[in-house]
Amino acid sequence: MVWIEGCQSEVKKYALLDTDFISKTHSVQDGGDNHLIDRVMELPEYVFFCHAQIVTELNRYNADAPIWLSEKIGAQKIKSYTDQEILESLSHVRGPLACATYTQMLKLACDVFSKDYFSEHYRALEDADYTAISREDYLKELERLDIEVGKKNNLGEIKSFVLNLIGIMLMRQSG
């Protein structure tokens, strides 16, 4: 809590959770049934979130962590964002440029892994006519391309990076 001119204001900190972090901290336990991730979740003033792709990836690699994550999402302890929800949020600040903005953020995220990653996997988004494409058609194309990316190609990390970039942009625009 922070006091500003006699008023109490809550300062929130945001923690973006990814597949590796959840999986590894869930696997670390004390002598009982207490997981390290549960201790992390007790950190005060934190808001935890992840991209929905993380749920998909955890289901591939870990038996218990997906159940734990689903319970936390259901209890609203962790917010899981889909691409559709991200685009809806972007629409509030970017209007008709929401899809183009998402594509720019996706390209930045892909560039972290390889300068060719975006052109290899998401070329169709770069060539899209953003003055004509609907959000629904954009999401269908994005989903199709994500499926083509497939397993073991850093999709969870890329989606997390996009969510982080867009979250930073939205926070700057609102504050």
Q: Where are the language model's segments positioned?
A:
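Active-site-proximal, substrate-binding regions of enzyme catalytic domains
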Residues: 2-169
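A two-mode feature
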Residues: 174-175
